[in-house]
Amino acid sequence: RNIRCLAIAGFFATGTTWGVTQWANLYMVKQLGVTAIYAGQVMSVFGTAALIAKPTIGILSDILPIKKNHLAALVMFLFAPALIVFASTSNPNMLFITGPILGIGAFMHSALTNALVVQSAAPHLRGTTAGFVNLFNQIGALLAPLLLGNVLVMTGSYQMSLMSIAIAPVIGACALFFIRLK
């Protein structure tokens, strides 16, 4: 059951992470009218925040008296409002605030879910289990940009495209509450 829940969480959260990462530049350039260089700078700050967030949440998960699956769920829940705030940003200067917040939300969960995969798998099946869960992560990463593109075609709005996928990490977070850790 734990592995199925992690696969579901990964499908939704990792799919959203890569869907957003692939579409954020277009949103900034096409919807907000910033230059590609400006959008690239915002995404560099997004990436830097994500880079710092992963080891930070790993350290916090070792220190805080909270189960890793609950902490991962909390982080996934926070990803949704971070995405909505980013997609609602109309002032390009604010992207340097909302971009890193989104970077943290988009990538922080994976450090915890990776640890949960190892913790949930039988020692002799850890590689197989990691491969299985990552298969669903990749399927999510494949389908999320397609979903965003379809919403864009239907609505003509990059903002609506990004907001449409904000529910996905919430679904992933809900799946994590069904994990039973020993």
Residue ranges and their predicted role:
Residues 2-54:
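Extracytoplasmic gate region of multi-pass secondary transporters
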Residues 69-84:
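Structural signature of the two symmetry-related core transmembrane helices
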Residues 87, 163-182:
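Multi-pass alpha-helical transporter architecture, strongest
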Residues 108-121:
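Intracellular juxtamembrane helix-capping segments at the cytosolic ends
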Residues 118-157:
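A late C-terminal transmembrane helix in Major Facilitator Superfamily
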